[in-house]
């Protein structure tokens, strides 16, 4: 309820004075008015606000006051409960029906006189001379009796005739007639049929402050939204107050149309209409049928037409999600970049006689990725945001598969015709770029126009950048950065890094002197916890356990518990008794002694293994290995970052058609130290080997045992396949004996 109605306003009030009065209180200056409709003659007005909280503040301030110079003003919320569909359609029909029924009743009353009046008139009327004679009366009585007997005879004969004709066929005919008279199911209107065919809605009368995120959030309660498009003016760049919403399911679009039409959103009354299909998609929306054995909408197409349709479909699907790794780079560009730096040709770099070409290319890609990540960090990009499940921005585009030698000027010239650019980033290797637009409309237009477009000898792969990708909104490189500004930024970054480090216990503290605090308020921070507990005797440290925020990259969330350490175990015991039930930020604490290493185990289970320091394992599990990879390839690739103690590359038990046993697509590596394993995981987590992205994670100790068990199981299955007779005998053992016991029969 973000729309208010003001009653009992003075009739001399004008719109400008009314608006100024609404914004005059200091507490209401920050409110956003989205719509005002003043009707001075009727002394009321409608005012729309951005959200219900602002409307509530205004209502509490002006309700029952004399702020507008007239009588006492009454302020109330405008109800946005729309009439039901049946009431909308049948209200007029019901009123007409009621009036016509009343008219028929009046006519019927006029046509049917009162019975008592008729009886009175017959008594008061004189006797007819013809009826006074005895003969006439006798004949009249006989005629009356005769008529009564005839009528009685007819009435007695009707049931017999009905019973005679009441056979099954007649009953069925009457039943069918009754069914035909029943009301049929309501047919869908033309608007509803259009929505079911396109899954698209057109929304009007939006506030100019409406964003695609807020509108999508409002409509997404009825189903998944694939696209939200807010048109803007080509000259001023201001929104037009309209929007197009593309739903994933047509039923969800129809439900949103019925529920949200004529409702209030951000202080304005929405007008929801069915949206037409996008240009070029009318055929898909119209559906298809079969006539004379041929499918409508299909014809004999040439190879070129089919290829163009496939390309168009690929471009359309590319805008819906993440199709490539965020740091994907063209292998040819990587090789060219490294070869250029070394002063050699690509053929010399990838010479098969001098070493493994696949491993060389993978190591070169790893080097280029490290340089690119360092460049992006200096440019203010949050690397943690480059995850596939992070929400996507509407103004940032990642440009991948760029050929080597592309300059930042050529990249700017490619995207600038589609709109105003905020920033363009291109690392020294020139294999991955970032382009940010000022307007999401321009970014969408550029994405559609340049996706899968050829640039040099490569095809561009575009991906929408993640939300919160940049640390600051200001674009880097706008002006020369002074030495003082650079020092301030370095000092600020160092301070943030120091603050993010967890408090470590003093090595001189006794064992068992750390307490576990459960039930902390999620708003409680580590500095606040230290301030509250620092007065306790023997206090050493205090910290709130944090985890990364998946919705806001670079920020952290409280996990609702923490730890406090003391110098001695005796001090910890006294603090345990004092802190039990103690309230911090309105939450009562539950305190107990912490178990050594429990917090690390808890972090490993909940937080994952992203940083490597949360587990001390030296074993790494490598997934998504190409089946062509050999032990030599894997050993050469990983031995560049540490010494390997063991390497296991499981193979399939059943040989292929060529007679060789192919790998199963994963491997187990064991390094000498945990530091080497962590360094290898950090360096190779974005690397490709033979075109496949390597997926690295810490291996649990029990996984190898499971692999051995699976291997024994597969061996048993293969042995059973070879010994088919034994399997048949085991299937025929109906007495429930052991499978391995032989029954003495020979096959």
Swiss-Prot record:
Domain of life: Eukaryota
PROSITE patterns, alphabetized: RRM (PS50102)
Pfam families recorded: RRM_1
GO molecular function: RNA binding
Keyword annotations: Nucleus, Repeat, Ribonucleoprotein, RNA-binding, rRNA processing
Metal-binding listed as a keyword: no
Signal peptide positions (record): none
Acidic residues bias (residue ranges): 157-169
Keyword rRNA processing: yes
Record region (Disordered): 83-117, 129-169, 595-615, 718-747
Gene3D superfamilies for the chain: 3.30.70.330
BP-aspect Gene Ontology terms: rRNA processing
GO CC term, one of those recorded: ribonucleoprotein complex
Subcellular location per the Swiss-Prot or TrEMBL entry: Nucleus
Compositionally biased intervals (Basic and acidic residues): 143-156, 597-614
Domain RRM: residue ranges: 2-80, 199-277, 395-467, 513-596, 618-701
Family: Belongs to the RRM MRD1 family.
Function: Involved in pre-rRNA processing.
Annotated protein name in UniProt: Multiple RNA-binding domain-containing protein 1
The organism of origin for this protein: Cryptococcus neoformans var. neoformans serotype D (strain JEC21 / ATCC MYA-565) (Filobasidiella neoformans)
